[in-house]
Amino acid sequence: MASTASEIIAFMVSISGWVLVSSTLPTDYWKVSTIDGTVITTATYWANLWKTCVTDSTGVSNCKDFPSMLALDGYIQACRGLMIAAVSLGFFGSIFALIGMKCTKVGGSDKAKAKIACLAGIVFILSGLCSMTGCSLYANKITTEFFDPLFVEQKYELGAALFIGWAGASLCLIGGVIFCFSISDNNKAPRMGYTYNGATSVMSSRTKYHGREGDLKTPNPSKQFDKNAYV
């Protein structure tokens, strides 16, 4: 019962993390920078994995898509690949988890389902590592440029998408670890066994009682013979 509850918790945590990781791909604010005026913010610069934009004080945004993939910076290409891999691994991990959970009716025996659940945990861990690496790589580039005194271009700060990605990656890692430990709970489950004591004769208590009663009522022929001998 405890193993089933832990699998359900792991599934909910992992799916929540996968949804958060997936939501970072279309999110706009991976990095953001603002130009403040004397009274209001005059412009906001932001970018994600696909485009860079600027929004003026009236709320009008002008965006520019990134050029060809071969002309992109290496860290953006790496982040794209890692985040897409994280989303794909999370999708397959959710399928394996549904098959391997004890509360589902597919997957075969309990031993086979435990192995599938462990595989789902490994896949979710890989998904979390990919997402964590991609977000950390992007954040490292931002912080390096921000604290570089020789960098004269527009400096950015960490956007909301990075924190969402880190949170989703952490949930995927936690859920994957719980899935992996669920197989050890299945191995610790007690087995019902029966011991063989050999063939034994069975006699009911009623039969024994009647047998004893018959023995008590049976007269001794030797005693009757002795009495008749003296008549």
UniProtKB/Swiss-Prot annotation:
Bilayer topology annotation: Multi-pass membrane protein
PROSITE patterns: CLAUDIN (PS01346)
Catalysed conversion reaction: Na(+)(in) = Na(+)(out); Li(+)(in) = Li(+)(out); K(+)(in) = K(+)(out); Rb(+)(in) = Rb(+)(out)
MF terms in GO: structural molecule activity
Entry keyword set: Cell junction, Cell membrane, Ion transport, Membrane, Tight junction, Transmembrane, Transmembrane helix, Transport
Pfam family for this entry, one: PMP22_Claudin
Segments in the Cytoplasmic topological domain: 102-115, 182-231
Entry GO CC: bicellular tight junction; cytoplasm; plasma membrane
The keyword Cell membrane belongs to this UniProt entry's keyword annotation: yes
Keyword Electron transport applies: no
Extracellular side stretches: 22-80, 137-160
Cellular compartment(s): Cell junction, Tight junction; Cell membrane
Transmembrane segments: 1-21, 81-101, 116-136, 161-181
A single GO BP: regulation of monoatomic ion transport
Coiled coil: none
Domains as described in the record: The fourth transmembrane region (161-181) is necessary for integration into tight junctions.
Quaternary structure annotation from Swiss-Prot or TrEMBL: Can form homodimers both in trans (interaction between CLDN10 molecules in opposing membranes) and in cis (interaction between CLDN10 molecules within one membrane). Interacts with CLDN19.
Described purpose of this protein according to its UniProt entry: Forms paracellular channels: polymerizes in tight junction strands with cation- and anion-selective channels through the strands, conveying epithelial permeability in a process known as paracellular tight junction permeability. In sweat glands and in the thick ascending limb (TAL) of Henle's loop in kidney, it controls paracellular sodium permeability which is essential for proper sweat production and renal function. In renal proximal tubules, it conveys selective chloride over hydrogencarbonate anion permeability which is required for renal chloride reabsorption and salt homeostasis.
UniProt similarity note: Belongs to the claudin family.
Name this protein carries in UniProt: Claudin-10
